From Swiss-Prot:
Homodimer. SMART domains: HTH_LACI. Hypoxanthine binds at residues 73, 189, 220, 274. Is the main repressor of the genes involved in the de novo synthesis of purine nucleotides, regulating purB, purC, purEK, purF, purHD, purL, purMN and guaBA expression. PurR is allosterically activated to bind its cognate DNA by binding the purine corepressors, hypoxanthine or guanine, thereby effecting transcription repression. It comes from the Bacteria. It comes from Vibrio parahaemolyticus serotype O3:K6 (strain RIMD 2210633). PROSITE patterns: HTH_LACI_1, HTH_LACI_2. GO terms for biological process: negative regulation of DNA-templated transcription; purine nucleotide biosynthetic process. The keyword Nucleotide-binding does not apply. Keywords: DNA-binding, Purine biosynthesis, Repressor, Transcription, Transcription regulation. InterPro entries: HTH_LacI, LacI/GalR-like_sensor, Lambda_DNA-bd_dom_sf, Peripla_BP_I, Tscrpt_reg_HTH_PurR. This is HTH-type transcriptional repressor PurR. The gene is purR. HAMAP family: HTH_type_PurR.
Length: 334
């Protein structure tokens, strides 16, 4: 493996000059730069990231904790983070925790050992334990995204879930729906509580009664949506519309309802949440609440860079505003 001394010897310059050319830390004549880069190419020389990190006190590496990167919402946010990391010359270490305490603990320890410059957190489970683990590493800059735990030492980007729940429900009401069901994620999740609060606000504003039996608990995955679809199919009196708290459940619900002979939106209307890429291409295309996922990823990375540069500034909370995307899964009844 070639060293910086080998490059300097082949180029006929000092190791200091090679360092300045590679790191762009000082003006070097163009002819000299060309000689150095030619030697770098011939020797297939790669600078030592370890040595550079020791000298600069920076590894240019970011860690990211996610519950499940295969989740379509998470994957689009991750894509945004990775894209901006690459553009800024940072490496992203992605850690799938599966919501498992031991994996969260071990990954945080590993990221600390690797001296990452900062950590992005997008986990939805074991919030108190995760908060405590993150707070133990107070020297590492952090940004918590979406469902993550509140931390006294981390900036946070959140979705205005209460407003999103309100917008989805109001759109159904504006289209003549009064018998509305909700398919939530786990009830203990803050985002779910806020979306239910938005649902209740819209129903109260329209002076409509709420059937508490129609506020149904899922897990943000298709399997519970299938069970709920079967439950709705068996109901003597069905809701005319279902507000699903993410698009994955909405698509699973629609698929199963249609398998059961219930047409969407002719028999039951469906509205989702997230606006994942697949929502536009499903049949029928899903009406949903849009979350700017790639922008969330970009903003999270930019905020983390600011925190890395200034570790002492006060904790900040950034709120992303939801928008409705109208497609073809809500029937107009009025």
């Amino acid at each position: 493996m070639a060293t910086i001394k080998d490059v300097a010897r082949l180029a006929g310059v000092s190791t200091t000059t090679v360092s300045h050319v590679i790191n762009k830390t000082r003006f070097v004549a163009e002819a000299t730069q060309e000689k150095v880069m030619k030697a770098v190419d011939e020797l297939n020389y790669a600078p030592s990231a370890v040595a550079r990190s020791l000298k600069c006190n920076s590894t240019r590496t970011i860690g990211m904790l996610v519950t499940q990167s295969t989740n379509l919402f998470f994957s689009e946010v991750i894509d945004g983070v990775e894209s901006y990391c690459y553009r800024q010359g940072y490496t992203l270490i992605l850690c799938n925790t599966g919501g498992i305490y031991e994996k969260q603990r071990d990954y945080i320890r590993m990221l600390a050992e690797k001296r990452v410059d900062g950590i992005l957190v997008m986990c939805s489970d074991l919030t108190e334990e995760l908060k405590e683990m993150l707070d133990r590493h107070s020297d590492i800059p952090k940004v918590v995204m979406d469902w993550g735990p509140e931390s006294s030492r981390a900036d946070k980007i959140i979705d205005n879930s209460e407003e999103g729940g309100y917008l989805a429900t109001k759109y159904l009401i504006d289209n003549g729906h009064t018998d509305i069901a909700c398919l939530s994620g786990h009830f203990e999740k803050l985002a779910c509580q806020e979306r239910i609060a938005g649902f209740r606000r819209a129903m109260a504003e329209a002076k409509l009664p709420i059937n508490e039996d129609w506020i149904l608990e899922g897990n943000f995955e298709c399997d519970t949506a299938v069970l709920v679809a079967d439950k709705i199919t068996a109901m003597e009196k069905r809701p005319t519309a279902v507000f699903c708290f993410n698009d994955t459940m909405a698509l699973g619900l629609m698929s199963r309802l249609q398998q059961n002979g219930i047409k969407v939106p002719d028999d039951v209307s469906v509205i989702g949440y997230d606006n994942i890429e697949l929502a536009e291409y499903f049949s029928p295309p899903l009406t949903t609440i849009h979350q700017p996922k790639r922008r969330v990823g970009k903003n999270a990375f930019e905020i983390l860079l600011e925190r890395i540069k200034d570790k002492e500034h006060e904790k900040r909370v950034f709120e992303m505003q939801p928008e409705i995307v109208i497609r073809n899964t809500v029937k107009k009844l009025n």
